């Protein structure tokens, strides 16, 4: 048994050093190329409208606010200033979303975003995005990369297609630090010793983002309050949970396997599903020793089996907001197909670790 585990870990490490590192290098190169174009577009936006200031800065070889959805798809979060005159209201009526309401006694004129405040005193995510979309469309025509970049049509999101190969979504957002949403108040679970109190404090201090984007849970329910709502996102908090042991390596293996074998019709699976399942695996295996290099095979296998279970149940709860289903809106046939493919992949890796050389 120990010999079989060691053999699997050996082949996973080989796969990581060859395939995962090559994937990382290729994506890093793409990110540099894509960010040059996005920065140029945002610079042009800022000239037209100084309230939209580019926050796409490179620090320690990574760009703040950039998320890799897949090797050809990215999201750039554009942090906006001055949320201060608004109260964050998160009553759970819109799963995964919250609203920003003008604080009592504050005048509209005190806000930097005065014309985007609704009659009821809410800062409208939709109105801000609509204005931003108009500015980006104008900037694309003026910027120095105008020959290689164009807007993606037929969406209220701000999406750029670059060199006909890459899609980048630019999402206006507010950063919320030092507060924690009520809809995530159950976390951490009291009976689970992971993460420890110090990491919990770090994660909560990191806070979350409020994004102006289409909320999939509200599809078909377009009342004005809902289209004015902001989507909760916990990217930095989630990144902190992946620190230590072989967690990041495990996630890198899962992303690479997804890119190569689970890029399927209907797009049932993305990197974020993998990241979510690593967090759940951490809860199931709370001891640091469970994430030792020697356990890499067990952890990967556990996550793949959990993924199959989620696909078969057609439900993958968000880690911090379990009322939010990450498979919402995905075609059932696509989820069934993904379950079969994941099962084949898991069986292949477990019964014949050497097969990783060809995967």
Curated annotation (Swiss-Prot):
Which UniProt keyword terms apply here? Developmental protein, Magnesium, Metal-binding, Nucleotide-binding, Nucleotidyltransferase, Nucleus, Transferase
Q: List the disulfide bonds.
A: none
Record Gene3D superfamilies: 1.10.1410.40, 3.30.460.90
Which InterPro entries does its entry note? Mab-21-like_nuc_Trfase, Mab-21_HhH/H2TH-like, MAB21L/cGLR
Its annotated compartments are: Nucleus
| Entry binding sites for a ribonucleoside 5'-triphosphate | 23-24, 63-66, 248, 252-255
A single Gene Ontology MF term assigned here is: metal ion binding
Keyword Metal-binding found = yes
Q: Does the keyword Nucleotidyltransferase apply?
A: yes
Q: Which SMART domains match?
A: Mab-21
GO biological process terms held by the UniProt record: cornea development in camera-type eye
**Per the record, what is one GO cellular component?**
nucleus
- Enzyme Commission number(s) of this protein: 2.7.7.-
**Binding positions (Mg(2+)):** 73, 75
Subunit structure, briefly?
Monomer. Homodecamer; composed of 2 back to back homopentamers. The protein may exist as monomer in solution and oiligomerizes upon ligand binding.
What function is annotated for this protein?
Putative nucleotidyltransferase required for several aspects of embryonic development including normal development of the eye. It is unclear whether it displays nucleotidyltransferase activity in vivo. Binds single-stranded RNA (ssRNA).
* Family from the record: Belongs to the mab-21 family.
User: What protein name does the entry list?
Assistant: Putative nucleotidyltransferase MAB21L1
Q: Which gene encodes it?
A: mab21l1
């Amino acid at each position: 048994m120990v010999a079989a585990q060691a053999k699997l870990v050996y082949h996973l490490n080989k796969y990581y050093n060859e395939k995962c590192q090559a994937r990382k290098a290729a994506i890093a190169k793409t990110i540099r190329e894509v960010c040059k174009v996005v920065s140029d577009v945002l610079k042009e936006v800022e000239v037209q409208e100084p309230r939209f200031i580019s926050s796409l800065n490179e620090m320690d070889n990574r760009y703040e606010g950039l998320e890799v959805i897949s090797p050809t798809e990215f999201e750039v979060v554009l942090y906006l200033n001055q949320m201060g005159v608004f109260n964050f209201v998160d009553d759970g009526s819109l799963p995964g979303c919250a609203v920003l309401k003008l604080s009592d006694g504050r005048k509209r004129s005190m806000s930097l975003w005065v014309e985007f405040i609704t009659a009821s005193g809410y800062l409208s995510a939709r109105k801000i995005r609509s204005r931003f979309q108009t500015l980006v469309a104008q900037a694309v025509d003026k910027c120095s990369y105008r020959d290689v970049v164009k807007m993606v049509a037929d969406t209220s999101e701000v999406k750029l297609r670059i060199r006909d190969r890459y899609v980048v979504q630019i999402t206006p957002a507010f950063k919320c630090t030092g507060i924690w949403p009520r809809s995530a108040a159950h976390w951490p679970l009291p009976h689970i010793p992971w993460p420890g109190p110090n990491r919990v404090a770090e994660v909560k201090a990191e806070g979350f983002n409020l994004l102006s984007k289409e909320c999939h849970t509200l599809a078909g329910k377009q009342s004005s309050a809902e289209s004015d709502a902001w989507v909760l996102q916990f990217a930095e908090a989630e990144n902190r949970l992946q620190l230590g042991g072989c967690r990041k390596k495990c996630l890198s293996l899962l992303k690479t396997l997804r890119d190569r074998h689970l890029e399927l019709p209907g797009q049932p699976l993305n990197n974020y599903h993998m990241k979510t399942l690593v967090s759940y695996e951490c809860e199931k295996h709370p001891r640091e020793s469970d994430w030792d290099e020697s356990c890499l095979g067990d952890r990967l296998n556990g996550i793949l089996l959990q993924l199959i279970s989620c696909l078969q149940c057609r439900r993958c709860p968000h880690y911090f907001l379990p009322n939010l289903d990450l498979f919402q809106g995905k075609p059932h046939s696509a989820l069934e197909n993904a379950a079969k493919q994941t099962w084949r992949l898991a069986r292949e890796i477990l019964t014949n670790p050497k097969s990783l050389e060809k995967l």
